[in-house]
């Protein structure tokens, strides 16, 4: 994490939820892979073939854009999957409680911060899986 400047009158902390507020490699992988598997299912191809397609597209994109990374949403869009569809897949397929557990240390630390600061969570996931994530961690 980089901290550029902390104002003297700090009133709030804004946390990204996934892989910042908590880390879980298996769930981070699942957030991507569940969409890739759904793409494979709808295309009638294997999950491994879909993973290969995604990896190849991302590699080609990086080569053509000075090493820049492309999101999974935009990768799927290049294969004809509207962003709205990939968002819907995340709503339907993500189950954070399968990977995350109540985190007492996180709860205690956030309680300390909450005494003095407003706490805000953000994510690029849809609201439903975000709320399920906070519930699983015990901080909703």
Where do the language-model regions lie?
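Substrate-recognition/cap helix-loop segment adjacent to the acidic, metal-dependent catalytic center
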Residues: 107-120, 124-140
